[in-house]
Amino acid sequence: MATSDTIGDMLTRIRNANLARHPTTEVPATRMTRSIAQVLKNEGFINDFEEIGDGVKLNLVISLKYRGKQRQPTITALKRISKPGLRVYSNRRELPRVLGGIGIAIISTSSGIMTDRDARRSGVGGEVLCYVW
């Protein structure tokens, strides 16, 4: 079944896999999900991701990151901000800080998908996709 919100689907799959302490999770591969996975990897929230499958049925296998003996998830929470029914945009001066800089906001800008920190540094605003902490 086709999903209307691939970003929300990706965040939910990561959240559910984290709660169940799964080592990996699989999400449909799109340009947007690849970019978000790359940002999560660069920020240290996930170990790695790779594409599997062929042709139309491409998936991303995301390797989740845990810490300590109790395997506490590195990602405490994921929150979808801009949704298909209500888009949320922010200019460069109003980019949100997540938990005073502890978390990140993932922003879709004209320069690509990046964190709020990178967008502030580049002086661009855009659509606030989600918060991760």
UniProtKB/Swiss-Prot annotation:
Keywords, comma-separated and alphabetical: Ribonucleoprotein, Ribosomal protein, RNA-binding, rRNA-binding
Lineage top rank: taxon: Bacteria
Transmembrane segments: none
GO BP terms, alphabetized: translation
Database matches in Pfam families: Ribosomal_S8
GO molecular function (one): structural constituent of ribosome
A GO cellular-component term linked to this record: ribosome
Subunit architecture: Part of the 30S ribosomal subunit. Contacts proteins S5 and S12.
Function summary: One of the primary rRNA binding proteins, it binds directly to 16S rRNA central domain where it helps coordinate assembly of the platform of the 30S subunit.
The name this protein goes by in its record: Small ribosomal subunit protein uS8
